[in-house]
């Protein structure tokens, strides 16, 4: 029985160690919170075909843990890893008066975001940086947004109007958890800016050539039906010109498998030009019929001559009436169709798009 006291001491030590472990590893521990901010300095080389752009920005991080989150940082939408410049401002993170750590990164590189081009050329696009931690999930690390994030006041992007900055944080679930058991989520932050294409791109660059071609088509209604070659030739030339304009204006767009707003305007132009060609053919046939009736008048007897003259007057009246109505209604129908296409594509917000 001499060994009993030693046995009790060993058991007591084990109990104390177990209690210490329970205190050191509490269940449901809170994830580390890292404050992230961004200051967008420049956006350039926007490539619609590749859904890419070049961004220069300053990122800063504040945290209280021992691990440096900038070491495991990953840009989710990085396009060219070899061209990424990610330079820390300080060799070692600073220690702030409140005990938290601080590091700042100068970031420059080429990134991507899938552009929504359905309303081109009245579209708006997001230019963003997306970043997350590669080693710790949302149960271990959560990014918090710094409210002082923004863009440089003098930021200018040729061909675009700079709108509101983008500052977002969201949880992204990883399907399959990369082969691990359980659910895997990452805290992801987005920094960027919203760019709006101004109205002048459509109304001063693209629509004027289209309207000029349609106006040339409209002039055929002022030509007499006897000039059939000029009427039909003008319409066919206008149709070919519209085709070339569409190819030129949409050359920088990637293949989408669907039509954009500009394509719909061109499709309306094709319909109107085809209708004008149909009108020219109809008028030409009526004019030929009138010419035939006029040639037969001399050989007809008096009773038949009166009937033929009445028919001739009716045919000539139809020709003049058809041209007159076409002169009046074709411009109205085309302009109204363009307005409806633009309105249905952007809705009431089209009136708030900057010039």
Where are these regions (language model features)?
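Intrinsically disordered, low-complexity peripheral segments of secretory-pathway and membrane proteins
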Residues: 29-69, 261-355
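Channel- or pocket-lining gating/hinge segments that regulate access to a cavity or pore
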Residues: 190-296, 314, 318-327
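Sec-dependent signal peptide recognition
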Residues: 12-18
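Soluble non-transmembrane domains of integral membrane proteins
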Residues: 30-194
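N-terminal secretory signal peptides that target proteins for export/translocation
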Residues: 1-12
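Juxtamembrane amphipathic/hinge helix adjacent to a transmembrane helix
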Residues: 185-192, 243, 303-312
């Amino acid at each position: 029985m001499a060994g009993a006291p030693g046995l009790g001491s060993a058991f007591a030590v084990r109990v104390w160690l177990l209690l210490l472990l329970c205190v050191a590893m509490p269940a449901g521990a809170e994830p580390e919170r890292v404050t992230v901010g961004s200051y967008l300095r420049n956006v350039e080389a926007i490539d619609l075909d590749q859904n890419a752009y070049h961004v220069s920005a300053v990122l800063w991080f504040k945290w209280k843990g021992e691990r440096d989150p900038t070491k495991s940082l990953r840009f989710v939408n990085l396009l060219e890893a070899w061209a990424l410049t990610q330079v820390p401002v300080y060799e070692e993170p600073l220690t702030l008066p409140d005990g938290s750590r601080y590091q700042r990164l100068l970031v420059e590189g080429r990134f991507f975001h899938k552009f929504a081009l359905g309303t081109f050329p009245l579209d708006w696009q997001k230019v963003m940086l997306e970043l997350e931690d590669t080693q710790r999930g949302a149960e271990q690390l959560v990014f918090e947004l710094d409210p002082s994030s923004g863009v440089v006041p003098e930021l200018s992007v040729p061909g675009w109007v700079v709108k509101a900055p983008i500052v977002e944080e969201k949880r992204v679930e990883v399907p399959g958890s990369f082969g691990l058991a359980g659910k895997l989520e990452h805290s992801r932050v987005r920094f960027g800016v919203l760019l709006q294409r101004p109205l002048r791109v459509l109304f001063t660059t693209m629509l004027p050539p289209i309207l000029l071609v349609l106006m040339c088509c409209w002039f055929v209604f002022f030509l007499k039906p006897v000039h059939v070659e000029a009427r039909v030739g003008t319409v066919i030339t206008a149709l070919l010109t519209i085709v070339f304009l569409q190819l030129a204006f949409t050359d920088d767009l990637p293949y989408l498998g669907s039509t954009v707003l500009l394509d719909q305007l061109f499709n309306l132009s094709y319909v109107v030009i085809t209708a004008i060609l149909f009108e020219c053919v109809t008028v030409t046939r009526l004019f030929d019929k009138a010419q035939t009736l006029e040639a037969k008048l001399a050989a007809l007897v008096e009773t038949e001559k009166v009937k033929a003259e009445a028919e001739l007057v009716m045919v000539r009246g139809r020709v003049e009436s058809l041209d007159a109505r076409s002169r009046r209604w074709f411009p109205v129908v085309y302009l109204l169709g363009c307005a409806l296409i633009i309105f249905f594509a952007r809705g009431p917000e089209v009136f708030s798009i900057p010039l």
